[in-house]
């Protein structure tokens, strides 16, 4: 037997045989894992179970060597006891009690921590850790709540701002509209005045229109109506009389010239009457006396071509002369009718 293949180990013998008997280990053709020195020795006898050795050496991070001292074994057992335990889950009753305690006071005092741990059957350190995590979550939720509140306030302010802008635009439009209406109202009287003046300019004068539309003589011998404001002379029947006098009874008054056409009414121009106010005023100033129309038998009377006789004072004679100078003359010929009418009209307007 090869002495290099015989090993005596009391430690291995004690672990293999709890009774404390010593064992001789004979080498042989063991596995390659046992090394060249322990070839042929079963792994179970040597106490080299891979599962056990790997679990015991997991904390050290490397496989424990075969030869170890007593101090190393004690240190290994100490570290196995200090291995972290599995995380425990809290029950629903514990969570509810912790939540109520946190709502009452989120700060945890030592006396309160001990009392909660005793009531809940938990370690004081576990209670402290739960409160710390709960405060962190509460701060996060508080920030979220503050953000939501500030965002809602911002949205409300933005809506109010947009509403104010809309009201401002509406009021500005109303101001512009009212200003335009006011300007139109201010300019409308002046335009109306201009329009009225233009209409007045376009419309002819009443006297002019009446004079332009009035005929002063007709072929039938009738005189048209005079324009407004013109004093109507008396009719020849009222003036031509044998003993006509004025209101004072002294024979003074306006001189009247009557042209009477008794024959050929269709061929001659007939003048009904003519009233000379200027001659009357001159006569009243001069007090020349009373002159009246007389028949053709009276002495000093002037007899017309048609058989009418009348007396004329000096002023009336002058007016008659002017009337005659204007060309108003009686003719028996029908071809001179138009010339006589034009001459009489020119004298009337002069």
UniProtKB/Swiss-Prot annotation:
It is found in: Nucleus. The keyword Metal-binding does not apply. Residues 188-198 have a biased composition (Low complexity). Residues 180-254 are annotated as: Disordered. Keywords: Activator, DNA-binding, Homeobox, Nucleus, Transcription, Transcription regulation. One of its GO terms (biological process) is positive regulation of DNA-templated transcription. Residues 83-142 bind DNA. PROSITE patterns: HOMEOBOX_1, HOMEOBOX_2. Expressed in seedlings, roots, leaves, nodes, internodes, flowers and embryo. GO terms for molecular function: DNA-binding transcription factor activity, RNA polymerase II-specific; sequence-specific DNA binding. Residues 141-185 are annotated as: Leucine-zipper. GO terms for cellular component: nucleus. SUPFAM superfamilies: Homeodomain-like. SMART domains: HOX. Belongs to the HD-ZIP homeobox family. Class I subfamily. Homodimer. May form a heterodimer with HOX4. This is Homeobox-leucine zipper protein HOX5.
């Amino acid at each position: 037997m090869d002495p290099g293949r015989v090993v005596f180990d009391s430690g291995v013998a004690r672990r293999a045989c709890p009774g404390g008997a010593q064992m001789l280990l004979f080498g042989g053709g063991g596995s390659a894992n046992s090394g060249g020195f322990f070839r042929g020795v079963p792994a179970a006898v040597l106490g080299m179970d891979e599962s056990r050795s790997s679990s015991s050496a997991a904390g050290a991070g490397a496989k424990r060597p075969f030869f170890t001292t007593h101090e190393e074994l004690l240190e290994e057992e100490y570290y196995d006891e200090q291995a972290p335990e599995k995380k425990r889950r809290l029950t629903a009753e514990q969570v509810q009690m912790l939540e109520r305690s946190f709502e009452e006071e989120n700060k945890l005092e030592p006396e309160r921590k001990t009392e909660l741990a005793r009531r809940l059957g938990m370690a004081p350190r576990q209670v402290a850790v739960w409160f710390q995590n709960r405060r962190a979550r509460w701060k996060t939720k508080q920030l979220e709540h503050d953000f939501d509140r500030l965002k809602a306030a911002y949205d409300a302010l933005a809506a109010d701002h947009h509403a104010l802008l809309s009201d401002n635009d509406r009021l500005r439009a109303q101001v512009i509209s009212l200003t335009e209406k006011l300007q139109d109202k201010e300019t409308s009287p002046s335009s109306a005045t201009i329009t009225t003046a233009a209409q007045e300019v376009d419309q002819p004068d009443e006297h002019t229109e009446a004079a332009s539309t009035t005929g002063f003589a007709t072929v039938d011998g009738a005189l048209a109506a005079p324009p407004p404001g013109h004093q109507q002379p008396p009719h020849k029947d009222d003036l031509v009389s044998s003993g006509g006098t004025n209101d004072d009874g002294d024979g003074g008054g306006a001189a009247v010239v009557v042209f009477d056409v008794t024959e050929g009414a269709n061929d001659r121009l007939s003048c009904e009457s003519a009233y000379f106010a200027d001659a009357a005023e001159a006569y009243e100033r001069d007090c020349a006396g009373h002159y009246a129309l007389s028949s053709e038998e009276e002495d000093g009377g002037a007899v017309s071509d048609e058989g009418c006789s009348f007396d004329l004072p000096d002023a009336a004679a002058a007016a008659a002369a002017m009337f005659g100078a204007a060309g108003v003359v009686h003719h028996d010929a029908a071809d001179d009718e138009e010339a006589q009418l034009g001459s009489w009209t020119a004298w009337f307007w002069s």
